[in-house]
Amino acid sequence: MLVKVYGAAVQGIDATIVTIEVNSSRGIKFFLVGLPDSAVKESHERIISALRVNGYKFPTSQIVINMAPADIRKEGSSYDLPLAIGILAAAKIVSEEKLSRYLIIGELSLDGSLQPIKGALSIAISAREQGFEGFILPRQNAREAAVVNHLNVYGVANIKEVIEFFNVERELKPTIVNTREEFYKNQENFPYDFADVKGQESVKRALEVAAAGGHNLIMIGAPGSGKSMMAKRLPGILPPLSLGESLETTKIHSVAGKLGKDSSLIATRPFRSPHHTISQVAMVGGGANPQPGEISLAHHGVLFLDELPEFNRSVLEVLRQPLEDRHISISRAKYSLDYPASFMLVASMNPCPCGYYNHPTKACVCNPGQVQRYLNRISGPLLDRIDIQIEIVPVPFEKISEKQQAESSASIRERVICARKMQEKRFANHPGVYCNAQMESRLLHLYAEPDEQGLNLLRNAMTRLNLSARAYDRILKVARTIADLDHSEQVTSIHLAEAISYRNLDRESWAG
């Protein structure tokens, strides 16, 4: 007897429906075809054990299973449940009447309980697009999948529940999530606030400019000057995620298996801070079974690289293309995957090996050559892609001991949102451009052309600091953002002067 059940394969951050054909005939062999990996092939033993523990017998007839389309590799153990249901249906133990209306996914334990899977949200979206009535999956993933409207999502704990459901011996209750309520309820959930930071007004201003224009930023300062503390507060002043951005961000984290138990939508911008020992694959994604890397997990959020020179140079160099293209392509011999990677890069570093170069009170013990070698760990092309380079000096005791509370993140965020709205209006007719940091040269000439006084200032700065053409564009982008914060349509010399001041690593005084 031939029956069909439906599962799904995750490719990149999207899912493809997999048709599982099960044919039962005379004989005793078990065949599984359709490009399954070793984990899928091992499902035979898990299914036998799960059925036996729950009082069902594995059929003694010959079982042939085909997983189509055959050109897509089927990876992981999430096919256990649909394979088991298909085998039982072919043996007439499970009714096949409702099988075509449901997409089924889940990993089986030996006792028949279901383990969580990766990519539940992507699979749910694909199930709705293909017109399935319902989606049956492990209970731990039910809330994540239930954010998809117009699809009945059933979270189950054991294979027995699924068997009894198809045999009309049990009713399954759909998991219901009010997507918009869930999303907006968690949007203001920020653990850190700029109100807790004393002093550092110039750094706060630089972070505000970075947030307003989506600019990459690096902070240079001595140990303990507050670089990490400031970076952690950046997501709290960024504009809130839109529902579409939230859905895309959640899909990436779902595919990577980074969503917590019973999670639904990610409502706040991601903040990723990998250790400096991270590998290239972990940073950009890939591997034997390709997974999103840190740059994709930071999509629509912040990627914070603390102690930037300590990262392997090859790891830093692979960031160059994603910083420009805002996505990363992972190529293999037979296929290519594309992961989104539109993130704000925020980095921090000491100014020298000892950490006290240019320190107001402590003496630096490094010679100019050591300082230069330390700075040279970061390549010029990577630094060119960082719009804002700001120096942090330690906060004096008088500032730390002040009783007056600093400006809150909420106040700064209001100004940032206002500037972003100006940019949305400006780029309404330019698809794919949402903030000033994404402007290319053509748009810079349209929207960031300085006045005559500003042009002279910029010309002198370019000559004196020996800046590249890319750095020239970066200065104009930052100046455009500063003008937006100032509610100005024209980029003036005042805006350019502030933008030029954010090129600290280009100054002649560095390293000597």
Language-model segment annotations:
Residues 1-218, 222-225, 331, 471-472, ...:
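Peripheral, non-AAA+ core regions of ATP-driven protein-machinery
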